Structure formats: C-alpha cells, structure tokens
Amino acid sequence: MATPTPMFDLIKTLTEIPGPTGQEDLVHEWCADHWSSFSEHTEITRVGNVVARVGGEGPAIVILAHGDELGLMIKSVTENGLLHVWPVARDMRGRPSYSYSPVNQPVIVLADSGPIDGQLVYASGHVIGGGTQKDHFEWNDWFVDLGYTSKEKVESFGIHPGTRIALNPPTRRLGDTIVGKAMDNRAALSIATSVGE
C-alpha cells in the first residue's frame, strides 16, 4: 500500500468537494480561502472565477484550471421518494454516455437544506417489472435512492427538479495511481495550489 503524500492529500481534498457544473461554489470557496494564505490578493469574480495574484519579481505566468465536474440534476421526484435524474451537461443522444459509469455509486444531493447522501441505482426488471434486457441505458432508467419512501419526505429537505447531484466515491490509491471522481480538473487545481505554496 502506497504511503499518503501531501499531494495525494491535496488531490483527495479537492476531488471530494462536490461541485457539479453550475454549483461549484464550495470548490471556489475552498480555493479562495486556501490561496489567500500565499497570495497578495485573492477574489471570486462575479462570474465565479477564483483569481489569486501571488506577485514576485520574475516573468508573469498564469495557471488555469476549472473546478466543476460531471454532475446530474433532478428531473422529478416519484411518489415513493426516488429521484429521476438527468445530466447537467447537454446530452445529444438522450442516454448516458461512457463518461457515466455510476451504477450503484454513492452520490451527494445538494439540497436546499444541505448535502444529503444517496445511491445512484438502475431500475432493473425486478424493480420495474417485465425483466426485459436493454442494449443500452436510458436516463429514465436511473434513479437516486435516498432511503426515504415518500415524495413529501424527500421534498421536505428542499429537493426539487433542478437540484444538483454530484457523484461521491472516495478518492483513493490503487498501487501507484490515484483514482476518484473529478480528476478533470481538480488535479490541476491541486498543482496550482502546490505551486502557489
């Protein structure tokens, strides 16, 4: 088992912050707070960019990265409390691309009342009846299960159509490799942070 390093710890911290497209605020806040310890000036602009000016005598350089990640949003809430999901990014084919391989993955729902853990599930024939096999997944076959059994309970947390969802697997080491979600582009944010320090 590989020994954790400061860079691994930094990547783990950044990749485990939920920040689906359109709701990257927690990532921006972490960067602004952390970068202010080594920069002359740090700000979050009106359009959501985090800018840190480090200063110095040498030539000016710019390090760029983005903080969002692939995410989902709630399309509807079923009467029995399951959440129909849809991709945040435009999906031309109407079904999950190879970018999504989240069967039975943990997720975090960014509800109005705060983050709520859930599980992304696929409606198998045992659940929806008929047992028919499909040659591809459709978005209508995917749900998030929060462990509640009523629409009213789920909605009481401030969960509604448009609420964002981020995948939530742990970032970990497999041999010499780091695996997890949001590596694109939180690894670059980790490098920018390390360079700034």
Segments predicted by a language model, with ranges:
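N-terminal hydrophobic/helix-forming segments and targeting peptides
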Residues: 1-197
